[in-house]
């Protein structure tokens, strides 16, 4: 598709879709809680729909009623063996978390994904789940999908130190631990997003978080809840950056989730000189509205414990850095290389093809700015965040056209992205 270029100031108010991480977990925990769970504000992107379909195939009744998702949970004993392969589409979250959940079930399943997911390593969940007594395997020593899993009703608790910073691996182990008899401990390298821990507690589960150590004694039963999903900060990040780098812009991003394990991008842009104001902050619910205006920015260093708190926002932060004065250095982000694409290389290649000055490193990027961006032929390579980054970059282009292939990938997390973009350009 041909992207909009040479945009004037962006003006208006936007409500971004529901948080993807919370939406997945609401469905997963609701499916094994006892009773009727209702979810408002659920993200209806393709990844979450993959999770919903998986649980329907596992015998859980899930319906939409009055703009809410209603899940008839039957407890951990209520799942039934699927009659077919579970297709997780493009969703690594679905595959890893559901594998953890099914670890304690007395049946076997085969889990597959699309071409992109089939290139993402699952060894990170295979090894701890095997230690708990699950028969699970993928392709080659990296354990690529498809995954074959035989659950075990007599799971063993483990103490596991994560070799990488991954909320998905942590979550897979905790979901298995809810069904294991005894004390499971997970020790993180760096603190990652904690939605699973918070939502297990919201559903009546018990665990202890002590710094980087999470302790859970199983088995436990969960109780149905009413969940309201906040706006996704990872989706809001695209408008946040657009407002900061397009001259004359002023945007209000409504009801954005600001869980502290996800707000690294806000800290980074403020350090770079961004003018942002928080309105209607609800600290208990961890939700706020964010007013953003065009700002003159300077380069910065992004590394260490900050990386897990903004890992999904790094592509759009890289674009931001191309418009900042000076050098921005991103380090310790090698996890980007095993996302939907090798995001370090793909971001570097796309933005450099548009005139940016970026050097890819083993674990990040060195970005020199500011640079003028020009038209180019690009692709999402099947990665939703790459597609949205490119669409925001195109708004800065004054010379040439920007063509984007495989734009349908954006449906993964933000089905109304282009509709919202057009509205902000016309408000």
From Swiss-Prot:
The keyword Nucleotide-binding does not apply. It is found in: Cytoplasm. This is 3-phosphoshikimate 1-carboxyvinyltransferase. GO terms for cellular component: cytoplasm. Keywords: Amino-acid biosynthesis, Aromatic amino acid biosynthesis, Cytoplasm, Transferase. Pfam families: EPSP_synthase (PF00275). Monomer. Catalyzes the transfer of the enolpyruvyl moiety of phosphoenolpyruvate (PEP) to the 5-hydroxyl of shikimate-3-phosphate (S3P) to produce enolpyruvyl shikimate-3-phosphate and inorganic phosphate. It is an enzyme of class 2 (transferase). Its EC number is 2.5.1.19. InterPro entries: Enolpyruvate_Tfrase_dom (IPR001986), Enolpyruvate_Tfrase_sf (IPR036968), EPSP_synthase (IPR006264), EPSP_synthase_CS (IPR023193), RNA3'P_cycl/enolpyr_Trfase_a/b (IPR013792). The active site is at residue 312. Pathway: Metabolic intermediate biosynthesis; chorismate biosynthesis; chorismate from D-erythrose 4-phosphate and phosphoenolpyruvate: step 6/7. 3-phosphoshikimate binds at residues 20-21, 25, 166, 168, 312, 339. It catalyses: 3-phosphoshikimate + phosphoenolpyruvate = 5-O-(1-carboxyvinyl)-3-phosphoshikimate + phosphate.
């Amino acid at each position: 598709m041909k992207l909009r270029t040479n945009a004037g100031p962006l003006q208006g108010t936007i409500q971004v879709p529901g948080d993807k991480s919370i939406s997945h977990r609401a469905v997963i925990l609701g499916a094994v809680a006892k009773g009727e769970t209702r979810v408002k504000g659920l993200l209806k992107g393709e990844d979450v729909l993959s999770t919903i379909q998986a649980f329907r195939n596992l015998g859980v009744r899930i319906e939409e009623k009055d703009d809410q998702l209603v899940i008839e949970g039957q407890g951990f004993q209520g799942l039934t063996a699927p009659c077919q392969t579970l297709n997780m589409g493009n969703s690594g979250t679905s595959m890893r978390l559901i594998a953890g959940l099914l670890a304690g079930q007395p049946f076997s399943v085969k889990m597959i994904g699309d071409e992109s997911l089939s290139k993402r390593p699952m060894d990170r969940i295979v090894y701890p789940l095997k230690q708990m007594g699950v028969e699970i395997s993928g392709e080659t020593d990296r354990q690529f999908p498809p995954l074959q899993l035989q659950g075990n009703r007599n799971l063993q608790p483990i103490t596991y130190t994560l070799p990488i910073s991954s909320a998905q691996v942590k979550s897979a182990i905790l979901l298995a631990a809810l069904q294991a008899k005894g004390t499971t401990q997970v020790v993180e390298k760096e603190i990652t997003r904690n939605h699973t821990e918070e939502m297990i507690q919201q559903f009546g589960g018990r665990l202890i978080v002590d710094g980087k150590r999470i302790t859970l004694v199983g088995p436990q039963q969960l109780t149905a809840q009413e969940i309201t999903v906040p706006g996704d900060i990872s989706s809001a990040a695209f408008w946040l950056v657009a407002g900061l780098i397009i001259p004359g812009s002023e945007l209000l991003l409504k009801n954005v989730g600001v869980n502290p394990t996800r707000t690294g991008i806000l800290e980074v842009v403020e350090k770079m000189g961004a003018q942002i104001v928080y309105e209607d902050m609800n600290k208990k619910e961890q939700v706020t509205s964010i007013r953003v205006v065009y700002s003159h920015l300077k380069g910065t260093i992004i590394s260490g414990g900050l990386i897990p708190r903004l890992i999904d926002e790094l592509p759009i932060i890289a674009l931001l850095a191309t418009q900042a004065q000076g050098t921005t250095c991103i380090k310790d982000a090698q996890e980007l290389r095993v996302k939907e694409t090798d995001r370090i290389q793909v971001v570097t290649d796309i933005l450099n093809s548009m005139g940016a000055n970026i050097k890819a490193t083993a674990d990040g990027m060195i970005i020199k700015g500011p640079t003028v961006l020009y038209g180019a032929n690009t692709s999402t390579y099947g990665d939703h965040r790459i597609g949205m980054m490119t669409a925001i970059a195109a708004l800065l282009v004054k010379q040439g056209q920007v063509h984007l292939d495989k734009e349908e990938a954006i449906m993964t997390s933000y089905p109304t992205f282009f509709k919202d973009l057009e509205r902000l350009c016309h408000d």
